[in-house]
Amino acid sequence: MTKKYDPDAVIIMGSDDIITKEIINFYVEKINSGHLLVGMKDFYIYESYLKKLAHWRGYGKLNDAHRMDETIGLGRCLARPLLDKIEFDVWGGLELRRNLDGAMTNRLKEVGIFPVSEKNCPVVGYGGKILRVGHVGYKLNEMNGFAIDIKSKTNVTSFDRYLNRDPESVTFKEGGILEEYIYKDTIEKIMTLDGQE
């Protein structure tokens, strides 16, 4: 479906995800410099039922060592050459309700796109262009941006799952940080969700 719009790149977003324009601008710069896949390594989570806000620092050594350089699923940005290579099918034809991020990472590995740091990202010449062939992630502070996943009672990945896997990876925050990045009317709508979608 997305292919009909002839995009230069696609950002993977859920209906309960918000990212700021700073992240989009950062992605545009990276895609224009030849990166095939960029994304975030950390994000904020708001649990609407419990009214709790937290920062998740990303995959860590404790329970996710095998995913250390992998980006989170929210906000992954895939460039057109990569989309063409995978025929615009990020999940490889699988009908999934869970583990979407890991399934996408595995699909990308099938075509040679592995999680790497920017400094270790392979660079190749292709069709007269320089391409950076890796799954490269950045921290929100490197992008001067903000990303949040609004959790309800029905989310695929619950708030508690982050806490249970690695309690040290979650830092609870005061709600004031939202006001730095999100419009007031949007914050008000988020606060009234009360666990509903």
Listing of model-derived features with the role each one plays in the protein:
Residues 94-197:
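C-terminal catalytic/acceptor-binding lobe
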Residues 5-8, 33:
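Active-site acidic short loop of glycosyltransferases
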